[in-house]
Amino acid sequence: MVATPYWPEVHHPNHQATHGRNGNVRYLSDRDRLKHRATFTGNTLVIPPQRRFELGIMQNTAGNIIYVVDSQRNFYVGRKNLGHFHHSSFMAGGPVLGAGTIVLGAGYQILEVNNHSGHYRPGARELKRVALAISTLGGDLNQIPFRVSGAGPDVVYGNGLALLDAAV
C-alpha cells in the first residue's frame, strides 16, 4: 500500500486543505465511488454501459484516464479534470495500493498502464500491485503494456508479466 499520500496532512483530524473537503477538488463518497468501479476482459477496460457517459469515458474516444486501486483491489477510473477531479478524489485523499494513468484506444482497449500520479507518487512496487489487481479483475497481463516512471528514465514493459518478473 502507498503508506503515505503526497499530502500527509490528509490524516490529521483538522485537515483543512484548499482542495478536497473544503476546496474545488471533489472527494467521492462511498456511494459515488461505486460509479467509478471497473473490471477488465483481456486487454479491455470494462465500464458498465450506464456509467460511461456520466464518467465521460466513451467507447469511441481514445485518451488518458486516471485510476486508483484500493486496499481491497477494487479498481476505480475517471477523467482527470484539473482543479476538480484528481487521483485523490477517489479515496478522499486516503491511502491506496496504486494509482496512475491508463492510455485507452478505441473500444476501451488498454494501450498502456503507468504510475503517473502527482498526489500518491507511486513507484514500481505499487505498479506491480496494480498489475496483480488487473489480473484478478479479468485482465490478461500478456496483452497490456506497463510504463514505470520515477527518478530515472521511464522503463517500458511490453506486458504485465515482464513487469512482475522485473527486480524492482
Regions flagged by a language model, labelled:
Residues M1-V168:
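Eukaryotic phosphoinositide-binding membrane-targeting regions
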